């Protein structure tokens, strides 16, 4: 085993830990908005580290550089699309009338909508 394989294995393990933390967040958070925020952040980081780790692991084991290139392309795509899709889902949930948790103290989107209505 060389250094790249070791780094790749560490990143895969690191990603697995973040997947576990995401699962805990889905269970522990009180409403859909907090759950989506927890899931998006930890799954994005977990997926990125796992994907890059697999690419480095494959490169360290003597496979072609194409493995690393493909995993980097996939990671960039995931980094760009995962937060955008989560934002879209949360916005759809808000517009559908799913209430915030009663412990939520700030609703900036509601304030934004009121300002937008007042400007028209």
Swiss-Prot record:
Cystine crosslinks: none
GO molecular function: sodium:proton antiporter activity
Xref: InterPro entries: PhaG_MnhG_YufB
Superkingdom in the source lineage: Archaea
Residues in the signal sequence: none
One Pfam family recorded for the sequence: PhaG_MnhG_YufB
Family that this chain belongs to: Belongs to the UPF0091 family.
Protein name: UPF0091 protein PH1455
Record organism: Pyrococcus horikoshii (strain ATCC 700860 / DSM 12428 / JCM 9974 / NBRC 100139 / OT-3)
């Amino acid at each position: 085993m060389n250094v790249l394989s070791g780094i790749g294995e560490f990143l895969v393990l690191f990603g697995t830990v973040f997947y576990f933390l995401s699962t805990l967040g889905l269970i522990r958070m009180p409403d859909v908005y907090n759950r989506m925020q927890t899931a998006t952040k930890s799954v994005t980081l977990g997926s990125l580290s796992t994907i890059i780790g697999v690419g480095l692991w494959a490169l360290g084991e003597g496979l072609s550089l194409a493995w690393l290139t493909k995993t980097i392309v996939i990671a960039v795509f995931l980094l760009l699309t995962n937060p955008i899709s989560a934002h879209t889902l949360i916005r759809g949930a808000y517009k559908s009338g799913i209430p915030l948790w009663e412990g939520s103290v700030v609703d900036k989107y509601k304030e934004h909508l009121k300002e937008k209505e007042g400007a028209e």
